[in-house]
Structure formats: C-alpha cells, structure tokens
C-alpha cells in the first residue's frame, strides 16, 4: 500500500462544477491575522506603515525590530486598546490578566529567533459573531460563528527572493507590526457562511478603525482549516484574497471527497497536514510528522497585561453602534432603506484614497433626510420620505463625486445637508425636473472643485435655475404639447416602434418617446405630461 500511495494521483473535476455533497459533510474553521493600524509597532517606537514603505525596505526599523542584542520590548498600549475594542465587538470574554509568550523558530524574516505571541493565556476567548439571512445572505435564518480566542502577537519581516541573483532579501519594515490572531470554531458548513463571515469581519475591523482590513496588502490574512466526515484536519495557507480562499476550499473539498471514494482515506486523511494554494490546486507543505516544536515559554521581559474591569465596561458603553445595528436602523422607520442602499452607508472602505468614508456619508444622509423630512411632513406618505434623499445622495451625488474625484468632506463645507435639502425641495415641488436637477447638481459640484471648495462660495439654486432657464413649465398649452409629440413621432419615422407601443407588445418603449420629449424641452416639461400626451396622441388603450 505504501508504494501505491507514492504513485497515487487524485483526479478532480473542475471547481466550476463544485457542489457540496450531502454524504460528505464540510467542517471548516478560520484563523485570521489582522494587522493593527496603530501609530507605532507593537514593542518599539518604530513607525507602523509596512504597506506604504514597501518601496523603502528597512526604513521603519528600530534596534529591537532587528533584534540587536540588549534591546528590550516596550508594549504599545494602543494595540491593547484596539484588541479590547475587537474583543467587545466579537462578544468575547476578555482575560483581565493575559501574558505574552515566546514561540521559537528560526527563519530569516524573524531576527529574534522567536515570535512574541500569546499561547498559554490569550487576550480574549469564547466569543461569537452572528450571521443573518436577511443581512449576510446565508441560507439559515441566523447562525453564530463561535470565536475560540483572540491573541495579540507581532508580525514577521518579509522575505523577497531575487531570482536573477539567487538570493533572498529581508525587509524588516513589517517586523514587530502588531497583529491580532482570531481563531474560530469549526462552525462553517458551506461557502456562503465563509464568504459572509470574512466580509463581515473585514467590515467590522474597518468600522472600528483598528485595521485597513485589506487582504491584497496582507493587512488581513486568512488560513483555513477543513475536513470532511470528521477525517483529519487540513490547514490551507497562501490565500491572498477572497476568491483564492473560496477556490482553495472547493479544490480541497473535492480532493478529499475523491480520496474517500478511492478508498485511500486511511492512508491520506488520517493525519493532519498543511497545504498551500498555488492558484489552481493545493499542494502539501508539511504533515504532522514534520510539525515544528515551537518550545513555547513565557516571555520574562514583558509584564502581564492587567486590565481593570471598569475600564472594559466604560469602553463597552462608549463604543459606537456596530454595523448590524446601523443597518437595522436604516432599514426601519422612518428611513426604510433597502438592504443594498443601507449597506452603501454602512460598508467601510480601507481608508486609502477614498472619496468618502461611511461615517461622513451616514451623517450627511441623516442630516439631509431630517432637514428634508421636516419640510415635507404631511405632504408625502411616510414610506416615501426617503425616496428623494436616497436617490440623490447615494446614486447621483456619489456618482458625481467619483467622476470629479471630489471628496465629500470638502464639498460639505459649502454644500451642507440643509442646502442639499433645499435642492431636493426644488425637485419635490416640481420647480425643476430630475433631468435638469442632474445637470444643475453636476454644475454646482464642478464649480466647487474649480474654486477648491472655497467656504466663501454661496450656492443659490434659484438664481442658477433662472440663469440656465431650466425651471419646469407647469402650465403648458395642451395643443402645443400635442404638436411637440406629433413632431417627435414623425421625426422618428419608426412604424414598428409605434405599433409595439400601441399594441402593448413593448409598453416600456413609450419611455423612449418621453426621453425624446425631455431632451427636446431641455427637461422643462414634466415626464408625466409627455407620457400622458403620447398615449393620447397614439390612442393607447392599455
């Protein structure tokens, strides 16, 4: 059998045909390493900026980072604060008396010869992160993913292999960067749960402002532990992004299923092993027989982390609402946003080169909504209150800001929520059409960019409306409007289109005619008036 095992090759179907089989139960857990976005490194005063300093290797290093003999670690308390926030958000039990330990191994990018971590007494444990069907898109109504533990530890340096010279270079800018390692229980049973958890955890650390959460830059790194039908656990590494994580799981699941069906489970799935992801398959890195003995021992140069219970309680009370709570608020009265729109207001970016952040956008939306709602109360149904603020902020304003590369924080110095509510009232009162409103808003934003959002700039929408002659014509002669509609139909000279509209075969095509009318009138005649007149001219019965 040993000879057979040596030459055995697993033949797999393409992962595009992946599906979970009921007779082979997936059991999966995650280990996520998150770089903390502190000002300084974990045990030194070096600047913590490994991503932006990548083109300047070894520029952010201290004597301790390079393991100069005689140097000692000094704990960065900001990292402890960040870890406490995450532990609270993950509903963990915080260890008020945790300690640091040394994990010994020798590698070029670990100059100390050991990593400072928390093996014997981790910072927090026994937490959970809830997933919900209506928010996170899982199949179950709700599911708790249990957190085994959180531990604070230091990151390693970075090894860079230069193929042309056959040498490995070491960059220690990342050495001693603070990490939190979060370990889950093996609660995941399908890919939807795994995808939802990773997205939710990533958004959480961004929301708490403790990490950029970027997978691509290594600020968040995910290892996967999985097995089928309670066979030995396989750990998957080298997973740079979400698609790699999911594809590696698919491939490994299919590999293990095929091994069981080939009768090779006792030979190949009886011992834990670590496998790497190549981009198309998993390859063996090491098995239990070759597992490193890390010789853990307490770090005697660092005192224990002793926290007072009242400090944790105070932090818990003063933390801002978490994303799920904000989502539920936005989807409830009086806002009644769709999940998609609410998520736009809640999903945090990585903070790099952003046009807006979720806090700024949320506040601008809420202030605009309430200013607008106070003016139209009693004149509009409650469930329609959010329609204009949502459409014009989330869809129009953000689109224009992206086109102009104009930060929201800059334009709000002049275009305040109250002034934006004035603009919405012009549309609500049919002073201008939506088409004219889009042109007017873009013009205002472009002007703000050209003046560098000078706070002395005043925005007078009514003057601009008169200047560009785009005020809606509310009283138009009916015969004149019929004449315009007839002229559009004759100019188009498209009998098939007209017939499809009249017969009801393509009812939505009437919107095309309306669009032509809006274009011809420069948006000054309401779309409803055009649609009603076109139906009258064509004698539409539907």
From Swiss-Prot:
Gene3D superfamilies: 1.10.10.410
Localization terms from the record: Mitochondrion
UniProt signal peptide: none
Keywords for this protein: ATP-binding, Ligase, Mitochondrion, Nucleotide-binding, Protein biosynthesis, Transit peptide
Pfam family, one: GatB_N
GO MF term set: ATP binding; glutaminyl-tRNA synthase (glutamine-hydrolyzing) activity
GO biological process: glutaminyl-tRNAGln biosynthesis via transamidation; mitochondrial translation
Enzyme class: ligase
EC nos: 6.3.5.-
Function: Allows the formation of correctly charged Gln-tRNA(Gln) through the transamidation of misacylated Glu-tRNA(Gln) in the mitochondria. The reaction takes place in the presence of glutamine and ATP through an activated gamma-phospho-Glu-tRNA(Gln).
Subunit structure: Subunit of the heterotrimeric GatFAB amidotransferase (AdT) complex, composed of A, B and F subunits.
UniProt record similarity statement: Belongs to the GatB/GatE family. GatB subfamily.
Name of this protein: Glutamyl-tRNA(Gln) amidotransferase subunit B, mitochondrial
Source species of the chain: Zygosaccharomyces rouxii (strain ATCC 2623 / CBS 732 / NBRC 1130 / NCYC 568 / NRRL Y-229)
High-level lineage: Eukaryota, Fungi, Dikarya, Ascomycota, Saccharomycotina
């Amino acid at each position: 059998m040993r000879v057979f095992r040596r030459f055995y090759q697993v033949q797999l179907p393409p992962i595009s045909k992946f599906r979970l089989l009921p007779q082979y139960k997936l059991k999966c857990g995650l280990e996520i390493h998150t770089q903390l976005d502190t000002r300084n490194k974990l045990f030194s005063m070096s600047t913590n900026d490994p991503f932006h300093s990548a083109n300047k290797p070894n520029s952010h290093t201290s004597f301790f980072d390079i393991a100069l003999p005689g140097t000692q670690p000094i704990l960065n308390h900001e990292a402890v604060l960040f870890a406490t926030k995450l532990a609270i958000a993950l509903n963990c039990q915080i260890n008020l008396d945790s300690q640091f330990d040394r994990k010994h191994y020798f590698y070029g990018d670990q100059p100390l010869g050991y990593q400072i971590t928390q093996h014997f007494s981790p910072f927090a444990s026994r937490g959970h992160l809830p997933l919900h069907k209506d928010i996170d898109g899982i199949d179950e109504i709700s599911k708790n993913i249990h957190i085994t533990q959180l531990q604070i530890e230091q990151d390693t340096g970075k090894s860079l292999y230069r193929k042309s010279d056959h040498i490995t270079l070491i960059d220690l800018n990342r050495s001693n960067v603070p990490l939190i390692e979060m370990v889950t229980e093996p609660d995941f049973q399908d890919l939807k749960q795994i995808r939802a958890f990773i997205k939710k955890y990533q958004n959480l650390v961004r929301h708490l402002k403790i990490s950029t959460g970027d997978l691509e830059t290594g600020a968040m790194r995910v290892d996967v532990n999985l097995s089928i039908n309670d066979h030995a656990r396989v750990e998957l590494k080298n997973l740079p992004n979400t698609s790699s994580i999911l594809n590696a799981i698919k491939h490994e699941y299919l590999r293990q299923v095929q091994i069981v069906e080939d009768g090779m489970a006792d030979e190949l799935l009886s011992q834990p092993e670590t496998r790497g992801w190549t981009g198309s398959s998993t390859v063996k890195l090491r098995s239990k027989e070759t597992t490193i003995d890390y010789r853990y021992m307490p770090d005697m140069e660092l005192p224990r982390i002793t926290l007072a219970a009242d400090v944790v309680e105070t932090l818990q009370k003063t933390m801002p609402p978490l994303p799920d709570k904000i989502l539920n608020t936005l989807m409830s009265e009086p806002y009644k946003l769709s999940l998609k729109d609410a998520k736009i207001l809640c999903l945090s970016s990585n903070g790099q080169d952003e046009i807006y952040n979720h806090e700024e956008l949320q506040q601008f939306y809420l202030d605009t909504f309430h200013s607008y709602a106070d003016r139209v109360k009693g004149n509009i149904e409650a469930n329609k209150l959010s329609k204009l603020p949502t459409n014009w902020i989330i869809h129009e304003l953000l689109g224009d800001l992206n086109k102009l590369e104009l930060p929201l924080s800059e334009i709000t110095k002049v275009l305040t929520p109250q002034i934006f509510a004035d603009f919405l009232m012009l549309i609500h009162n049919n002073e201008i059409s939506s088409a004219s409103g889009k042109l007017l808003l873009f013009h205002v934003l472009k002007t703000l960019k050209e003046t560098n959002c000078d706070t002395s700039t005043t925005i007078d929408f009514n003057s601009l409306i008169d200047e560009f002659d785009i005020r809606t014509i509310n009283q138009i002669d009916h015969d004149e409007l019929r004449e315009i509609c007839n002229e559009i139909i004759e100019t188009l000279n498209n009998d098939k289109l007209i017939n499809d509209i009249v017969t009801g075969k393509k009812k939505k095509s009437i919107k095309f005619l309306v669009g032509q009318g809006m274009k011809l009138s420069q948006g000054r005649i309401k779309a409803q008036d055009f649609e009603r007149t076109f139906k009258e001219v064509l004698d539409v019965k539907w």
